[in-house]
Amino acid sequence: MTNILINNAFGSDNPEKASVAFIVGGASAARDGETALFLTSEAINLARKNGTNGLQADGYKPMDELVQTYMDNGGILWVCKACADAKGMTADDLIDGAEIAGAGHTLSFVDDGAQVLM
């Protein structure tokens, strides 16, 4: 099965787009192959402890449930290092299972054959 990389730049600024990224990610993570969600810009706050509290797009499940389902299905959660540095975020700020990853780390995943969804 093909590995999948999903790039998500949306968080509380557009909860609907953020929700869709985690819904697609959760479905992909439940399949064979690896799925990584690369969070950039506002989306990095979704990996922050308590960063999804109270966040829910109209008609969608709460963001904390979508993130938890993604993680429970074996999804990989990467936070853009440049974005984290710009916002003063460290590994201690992240939910369990999330990690800060630089561009090289993410591009290696693509070089190894991952398909990219934006």
List PLM regions with ranges.
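Short, glycine-rich nucleotide/cofactor-binding loops
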Residues: 5-19, 50-51
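Histidine-anchored nucleotide/phosphate-binding helix
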Residues: 18-32, 37
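Short beta-alpha junction loops
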Residues: 41-44, 84
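N-terminal beta-loop-helix "entrance" segment that forms/cooperates
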Residues: 43-57
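A glycine-rich helix N-cap at a beta->alpha junction
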Residues: 53-81
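C-terminal structural segments of small proteins and small subunits
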Residues: 86-111, 116-118
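Short internal beta-strands
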Residues: 35-40, 77-81
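Anion (oxyanion) recognition and catalysis
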Residues: 29-30, 71, 110
